């Protein structure tokens, strides 16, 4: 948090776990989304359905008032399968575990986003993160604590509808192995 206090508040920073894979244009897509919505606290580049269980109450409340809000199964099955592979979860268990979960998608001024961000990877304005840490000095101590702190501070948490980032769980699967050289 000390470094955040010396950079200008409008500086866009990125935080991520070390086992993330980035597709081309991930940063631009995230920043473009951030600039398309008001009062954004976080933008992630990969939607995960189970993440939509917490930390998005403010975003959903805002969306119902100012945007188009939809619930459904919008995330492609393959992305769900990739998520399962990255965390070592069996597909059949995941299908059962998430059977009642719905994706929460919003559209504001023609720009779609998911109503969630992921603590494993996000971009934000440095000043917003400083404000969140002022309100909750334990926000960086746990993933859900951060997610809920951003939500509780009244910031939108968004994810691109296209997958620009992917959790790889420190293992490259057969699809990602050939890409490691191309994007290095």
Residue ranges and their predicted role:
Residues 2-12:
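Active-site nucleotide-sugar/metal-binding loop of Leloir-type enzymes
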Residues 19-21:
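Acidic metal-phosphate-binding loop of nucleotide-sugar-dependent transferases
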Residues 23-125:
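Conserved catalytic core of nucleotide-sugar-dependent glycosyltransferases
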């Amino acid at each position: 948090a000390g470094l955040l206090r010396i950079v200008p508040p409008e500086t866009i920073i990125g935080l991520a776990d070390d086992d993330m894979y980035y597709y081309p244009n991930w940063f631009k897509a995230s920043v473009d989304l951030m600039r398309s919505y008001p009062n954004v606290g976080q933008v992630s580049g990969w939607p995960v359905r189970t993440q939509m269980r917490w930390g998005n109450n403010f975003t959903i409340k805002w969306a119902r008032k100012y945007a188009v809000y939809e619930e459904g199964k919008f995330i492609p099955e393959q992305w769900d399968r990739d998520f399962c592979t990255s965390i070592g979860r069996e597909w059949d268990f995941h299908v059962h575990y998430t059977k009642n979960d719905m994706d929460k998608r919003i559209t504001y001024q023609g720009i779609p986003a998911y109503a969630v961000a992921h603590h494993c990877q996000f971009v934000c304005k440095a000043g917003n993160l400083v404000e969140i840490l002022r309100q909750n000095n334990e926000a960086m101590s746990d993933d859900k604590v951060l997610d809920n702190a951003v939500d509780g501070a009244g910031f939108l948490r968004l994810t691109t509808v296209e997958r620009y980032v992917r959790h790889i769980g420190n293992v490259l699967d057969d699809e990602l192995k050939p890409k490691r050289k191309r994007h290095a």
